Structures are given as structure tokens and as C-alpha cells.
């Protein structure tokens, strides 16, 4: 987090045409998450993957997990000219998870 802010300041102050922002995704429906949920089931924390997924989704005010496409669209935005005056920012894309 602070590394990206320091890099953003350094690039801006040196006049480099480089913007540095950080993307902070929440839980995303990916094979990696499915693997983690399966491990939780195997350890006895949940009876099945569906229950584990629903429980994790319920921790988000939006009551669901992100899709990879949603995170990708956020990354495309911060890399685009639409965010040309954005540097040193933290874009939180977590369905409200950290807002609660």
C-alpha cells in the first residue's frame, strides 16, 4: 500500500508520465477461491463448498462474491485515460466488505 503511494509520488514529482495506483479486490469467484473453500470443507469448517461460498458471500454488504470480470474492468479503468488524473489512489473493489 505505501509502496504504491511512494512510487506514485516519486513518478509525479520527477515528471515521469507514469501513474501508480493499487487495486484492492475482495473475494472473487475463481478456481483459487474454490480450492480454498474446498480446504475449509476438508478441515470441517463447513459441510460443503456451497455453504462455505454462501457464508463468505454473506460477509459482504452486497451479499455476493465478485466476478473476475468485475475486477478486470476496475483494472482497465485505472489503466485508462479516464483515470488520467488519478495516481497514488487505492481502488477498493470488495462489495463493501471493508466498509462494514
Positions of predicted regions on the chain:
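Conserved catalytic helix of short-chain dehydrogenase/reductases
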Residues: 1-14
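Short, small/polar-rich loop/turn modules that mediate ligand/substrate recognition or access, typified
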Residues: 14-19, 86-88
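A conserved structural motif in NAD(P)-dependent oxidoreductases
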Residues: 45-50, 60-71, 82
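Conserved SDR Rossmann-fold cofactor-binding beta-strand/turn motif
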Residues: 19-29, 79, 92-94
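Short C-terminal tail/terminal secondary-structure segment
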Residues: 64, 75-77, 82, 87-100
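A glycine/serine/threonine-rich, flexible loop-to-helix segment
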Residues: 27-59
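A short hydrophobic alpha-helix cap/turn motif
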Residues: 11-16, 28, 66, 79
Amino acid at each position: 500500500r505505501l509502496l504504491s503511494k511512494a512510487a506514485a509520488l516519486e513518478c509525479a514529482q520527477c515528471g515521469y508520465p507514469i501513474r501508480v495506483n493499487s487495486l484492492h479486490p475482495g473475494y472473487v469467484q475463481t478456481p483459487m477461491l474454490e480450492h480454498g473453500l474446498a480446504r475449509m470443507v476438508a478441515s470441517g469448517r463447513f459441510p460443503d463448498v456451497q455453504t462455505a461460498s454462501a457464508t463468505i458471500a454473506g460477509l459482504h454488504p452486497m451479499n455476493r462474491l465478485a466476478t473476475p470480470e468485475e475486477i478486470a474492468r476496475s483494472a482497465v479503468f485505472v489503466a485508462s485515460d479516464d483515470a488520467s488524473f488519478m495516481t497514488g489512489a487505492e481502488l477498493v473493489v470488495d462489495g463493501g466488505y471493508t466498509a462494514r
